[in-house]
């Protein structure tokens, strides 16, 4: 099964049959975005405009955590007992800029405690979030454009300056190849990252 978000719905697609097999609606969602799956099979979905993370558990899709300190959550990734969140930033403006860009957050899955990864120094309007396989994470900055590696201590290293629109990303395991869709350029960039 493939799971995707679609504005206010989580959609399950049966790849073998080539059709939608189920949908769950989040009535109060404003803009569902990224998703991640924990070790128990629960699916977490960010609502960037609603400062909410939804969860599909036992076939029930509901708000799991709503908090302004999520800073407009975008990218998600499960790391053991924590849900990592790549937020867009604080004080979202009409043009989607923020007064304070985002930095990685960690949410304890058991207690829902939100903490900052590292110093909390702003990195960017974060979109994509994927582990690098070595204890750090790749993130993209959609507004300014860029691919970063963020260490487990929260230190950000700019790997590549890019155009605006560097969106969600994917990592081809074992190859250190990062795929970044460039929404404004209508292309996907493949990068070999060491």
What spans do the regions from the language model cover?
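Beta-rich, blade/repeat-based domains predominating
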Residues: 1-2, 26-43, 69-91, 98-101, ...
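A short beta-strand motif characteristic of beta-propeller blades
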Residues: 19-25, 60-66, 112-120, 154-160
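Short loop/turn segments that connect beta-strands within beta-propeller blades
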Residues: 14-19, 56-60, 108-112, 150-155, ...
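Flexible "stalk/tail and boundary" regions
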Residues: 1, 55-60, 77-81, 149-155, ...
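Asp-box/WD-like beta-propeller blade repeats and closely related beta-sheet repeat scaffolds
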Residues: 9-46, 50, 63-64, 72
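Glycine/small-residue-rich hydrophobic helix-like segments
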Residues: 99-157
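A short loop-to-beta-strand structural motif that recurs across blades of beta-propeller domains
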Residues: 9-11, 52-55, 103-105, 146-148, ...
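Short, solvent-exposed loop/turn segments at conserved positions within beta-propeller repeat blades
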Residues: 5, 48-49, 92-102, 142-143, ...
């Amino acid at each position: 099964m493939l799971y995707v978000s679609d504005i206010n719905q989580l959609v399950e697609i049966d790849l073998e049959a080539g059709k939608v097999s189920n949908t769950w609606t989040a009535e109060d969602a404003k803009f569902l975005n990224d998703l991640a799956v924990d070790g128990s099979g629960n699916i977490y979905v960010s609502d960037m405009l609603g400062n909410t993370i939804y969860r599909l558990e036992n076939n029930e899709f509901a708000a799991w955590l709503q908090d302004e300190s999520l800073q407009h959550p975008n990218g998600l990734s499960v790391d053991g007992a924590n849900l990592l969140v790549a937020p867009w930033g604080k004080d979202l403006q009409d043009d989607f800029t923020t007064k304070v860009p985002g930095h990685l957050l960690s949410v304890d899955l058991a207690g829902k405690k939100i903490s900052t990864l590292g110093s909390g120094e702003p990195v960017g309007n974060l979109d994509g979030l994927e582990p690098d396989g070595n204890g750090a994470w790749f993130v993209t900055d959609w507004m300014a454009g860029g691919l970063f590696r963020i260490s487990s201590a929260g230190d950000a290293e700019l790997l590549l300056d890019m155009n605006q629109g560097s969106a969600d990303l994917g990592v081809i395991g074992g190859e250190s190849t990062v795929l970044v869709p460039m929404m404004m350029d209508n292309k996907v960039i493949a990068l070999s990252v060491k």
